[in-house]
């Protein structure tokens, strides 16, 4: 599962309850969250949501401004070992965007789960291309034997349409940055045939969105992989309905079932 939880925008306190309710209903084994808040004096949104689920959690390294940080998080039913990696700008210099590289001690073996949030600007495709290429390199360095092990999962808010260069280079629609590593996009494999918009004008939080009707959030499964491990069995959206009068986030979540044996 992946979900951009919209930091502390809008009615964030009411939304926190709605986020928890949606997560409880979906009961994901592993979820990547973006735009997670942490207070410098200790309160941590990821920790609170994980506690409600009974999950382990990890976040990217927080950088505080005015007492608050904006991070990516992974919540998991199983123990996590995680590190933070900085992602580049188009010119190769470090940006403020990060990836959380998590190794999860799952009952079916080690699961490499990478959660990220790429640059958002409409005209920043070149930056997102550099960031996607770096993600591929990081995953290639970290993955287990692709002929034997469960494949890596890449999740996040990519702020890009599926025909954009940054997505095409991950899915093998153009030359991949790391030969021998591409990713299956879970939605066209396991979705319901709809566009799968996660940035949808039906969401009341997007009443004034500049460019709605977009699928910005993705779950990717690494390839090559030993069939049938990692095969997408089903993919769906979550978080579309209001909980106690509030929709949980401005993005809808993407959830998938993967074959584990």
Model-derived features with residue positions:
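Charged helix-capping and loop-helix junction motifs
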Residues: 16-17, 45, 128-136
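Structured beta-strand-rich core segments of catalytic domains in phosphoester-bond hydrolases
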Residues: 12, 30, 34-120, 218, ...
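A short secondary-structure junction signal
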Residues: 85, 114, 124-127, 165-167
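Active-site beta-strand/loop signature of hydrolases that rely on acidic residues for catalysis
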Residues: 1-5, 19-42, 75, 102, ...
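Short glycine-/acidic-enriched loop or helix-start segments at secondary-structure transitions
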Residues: 41-44, 48, 125, 163-166, ...
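Metal-dependent phosphoester-hydrolase catalytic domains
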Residues: 140-153, 160-261
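Alpha-helical scaffolding within the catalytic cores
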Residues: 17-18, 88, 97-100, 202-205
């Amino acid at each position: 599962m992946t979900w951009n939880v919209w930091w502390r925008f809008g009615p964030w306190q009411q939304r926190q309850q709605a986020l928890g309710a949606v997560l409880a209903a979906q009961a994901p084994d592993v979820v990547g969250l973006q735009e997670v808040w942490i207070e410098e004096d200790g309160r941590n949104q990821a920790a609170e949501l994980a506690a409600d689920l009974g999950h382990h959690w990890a976040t990217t390294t927080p950088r505080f401004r005015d007492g608050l940080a904006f991070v990516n998080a992974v919540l998991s039913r199983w123990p996590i070992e995680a590190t933070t990696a900085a992602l580049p700008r188009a010119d190769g210099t470090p940006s403020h965007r990060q990836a959380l590289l998590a190794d999860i001690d799952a009952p079916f073996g080690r699961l490499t789960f990478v959660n990220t949030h790429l640059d958002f600007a409409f005209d920043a495709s070149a930056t997102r291309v550099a960031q996607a290429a770096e993600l591929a390199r990081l995953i290639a360095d970290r993955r287990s034997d692709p002929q034997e092990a469960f494949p890596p999962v890449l999740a996040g808010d990519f702020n890009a349409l599926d025909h954009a260069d940054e997505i095409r280079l991950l899915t093998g629609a153009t030359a991949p940055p790391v030969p021998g590593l591409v990713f299956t996009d879970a939605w066209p494999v396991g979705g319901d045939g709809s566009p799968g918009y996660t940035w949808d004008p039906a969401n009341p939080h997007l009443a004034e969105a500049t460019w709605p009707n977009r699928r910005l959030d993705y779950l990717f499964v690494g390839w090559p992989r030993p069939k049938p491990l990692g095969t997408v069995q089903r993919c769906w959206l979550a978080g579309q309905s209001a909980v106690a009068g509030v929709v949980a986030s401005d993005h809808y979540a993407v959830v998938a079932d993967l074959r584990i044996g």
